[in-house]
């Protein structure tokens, strides 16, 4: 243990140029490189976690707006609900109109409901 402490003291006393020379000598003697593997870390970060694109969406009726009757008609057409069920859904907003639908179908439903006067969001 005393030898290690003595070695640490001697290494601490080296100048920067002497430390660089020591590094080169050790690299040659042991056949290694003191360069940091930066490229490997960058590649690992890129392959870490691919972002998955969402494939299923929920269409949420946030607010029916001023034209409730038009929104109720659209909800009935989209969901095949009866008049009372569609009315309850619209008046109980925010509620899901359709769940787990494709991106295209969700966008189509959102467009129809917004044209009828509703506020809609996709989740």
From Swiss-Prot:
PANTHER family given in the database record: 39S RIBOSOMAL PROTEIN L12 (PTHR45987), LARGE RIBOSOMAL SUBUNIT PROTEIN BL12M (PTHR45987:SF4)
GO biological process: translation
Gene this chain is encoded by: rplL
Name this polypeptide is given: Large ribosomal subunit protein bL12
Superkingdom assignment: Bacteria
Gene3D superfamilies found in the cross-reference section: 3.30.1390.10, Single helix bin (1.20.5.710)
Quaternary structure and partners: Homodimer. Part of the ribosomal stalk of the 50S ribosomal subunit. Forms a multimeric L10(L12)X complex, where L10 forms an elongated spine to which 2 to 4 L12 dimers bind in a sequential fashion. Binds GTP-bound translation factors.
GO terms for cellular component: cytosolic large ribosomal subunit
SUPFAM superfamilies (alphabetical): ClpS-like (SSF54736), Ribosomal protein L7/12, oligomerisation (N-terminal) domain (SSF48300)
Family: Belongs to the bacterial ribosomal protein bL12 family.
Function as written in the Swiss-Prot or TrEMBL entry: Forms part of the ribosomal stalk which helps the ribosome interact with GTP-bound translation factors. Is thus essential for accurate translation.
Coiled-coil features, chain-numbered ranges: none
GO molecular function: mRNA binding; structural constituent of ribosome
Keyword vocabulary terms for this entry: Ribonucleoprotein, Ribosomal protein
InterPro entries associated with the record: Ribosomal_bL12, Ribosomal_bL12_C, Ribosomal_bL12_C/ClpS-like, Ribosomal_bL12_oligo, Ribosomal_bL12_oligo_N_sf
């Amino acid at each position: 243990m005393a030898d290690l402490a003595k070695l640490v003291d001697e290494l601490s006393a080296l100048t920067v140029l002497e430390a660089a020379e020591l590094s080169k000598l050790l690299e040659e003697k042991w056949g290694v490189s003191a360069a940091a593997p930066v490229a490997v870390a960058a590649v690992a970060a890129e392959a870490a976690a691919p972002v998955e694109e969402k494939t299923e969406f929920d269409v949420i009726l946030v607010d029916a707006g001023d034209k409730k009757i038009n929104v109720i008609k659209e909800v009935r057409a989209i969901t095949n609900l009866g008049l009372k069920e569609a009315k309850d859904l619209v008046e109980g907003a925010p509620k899901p109109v359709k769940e787990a639908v494709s991106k295209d179908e969700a966008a189509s439903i959102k467009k129809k409901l917004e044209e009828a006067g509703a506020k809609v969001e996709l989740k």
